[in-house]
Amino acid sequence: MRETPSVRSARDSWGITESVGATALGVAAARAAETAQADPLIRDEFAFLLVSAAGPTWAQMAVSDPHWLGADADARRIHEISRNYQAVRTHYFDEYFSDVAHAGIRQVVILAAGLDSRAFRLDWPAGTTVFEIDQPKVLEYKTATLDAHGAVAKARYVPVPADLRDDWPAALVEAGFDPAQPTAWLAEGLLPYLPADAQDRLFELVGVNSAPGSRIAVEAFNMSPERYTEERRAQRRARGEQMRKQLDLDIDVDALMYTADDRADAAQWLSEHGWQVEAVPSADEMARLGRPAAEADLAEFGMDGVLMRARLDGERL
């Protein structure tokens, strides 16, 4: 097995401005910036407050115009591609939840939820429970921030502090999850931050805890070592240097990811384990929603992934 090193350790943990936690701030900032556009693809009225509560450095990332990039046209182009990608990804999974709600599923589990605000911003049918699993400090930050601003969930909202590398199903059941009921699962922006064997174990545990008719939506990427060589990582770090200097941040997202040439293809794994999968390349979904981007640009910045949804019992999605 070939792999490129990660700065992560087997038992690492983090708060919202640290390590993987900081990536949740970056994603929420992109949603806030999209929401502030004249014709936004998605609206997340909670994104800005969740980002700005982390401090002014983060808040300036969450506005419509990336003024902090100055006149650097290339940096602005990259920023726009990233914002568009995050908007399209969010839209795809919002549609997924709308579909599963109409299908009658009333139990939702968001894995590594970060600063996801769907429990508060989507219109859930009566009787829906949204469970969110993430690191304790991340969930503490989110719930405290939302409570301080009087945010009211539109479903029964249950944060579950747990590490996805531990026995998280036990924590989920203890919080009220019923594995006998169909569940809608979400793994968005998660898989690159799991070792290959942990990804397999995650899917196995999801399957064990999924009743017939359950659904799952996943964002997957090509995490082979060839894509994340030290040379390519250095090139990507150099491209993002102005952003880090302007924002006074020292975060190397690539170094937080796990790469290995034996990582299972998510769609193939799910198909082989009884799930009926429908998948779309991110470039195709971006084009469909009017936010096209060159595939070479998406590949260079790790956004040439696959968005997929699957149903356990093999019926049409």
Curated annotation (Swiss-Prot):
E.C. code: 2.1.1.-
GO BP terms in the entry: methylation
Leading EC class: transferase
Family label: Belongs to the UPF0677 family.
The organism's place on the tree of life at top rank: Bacteria
Molecular-function annotations in GO: methyltransferase activity
Positions contributing to S-adenosyl-L-methionine binding: 134, 163-164
Annotated protein name in UniProt: Putative S-adenosyl-L-methionine-dependent methyltransferase MSMEG_0093
Pfam families: LCM (PF04072)
Protein function: Exhibits S-adenosyl-L-methionine-dependent methyltransferase activity.
NCBIfam families: mthyl_TIGR00027
Species per Swiss-Prot/TrEMBL record: Mycolicibacterium smegmatis (strain ATCC 700084 / mc(2)155) (Mycobacterium smegmatis)
The entry's keywords: Methyltransferase, S-adenosyl-L-methionine, Transferase
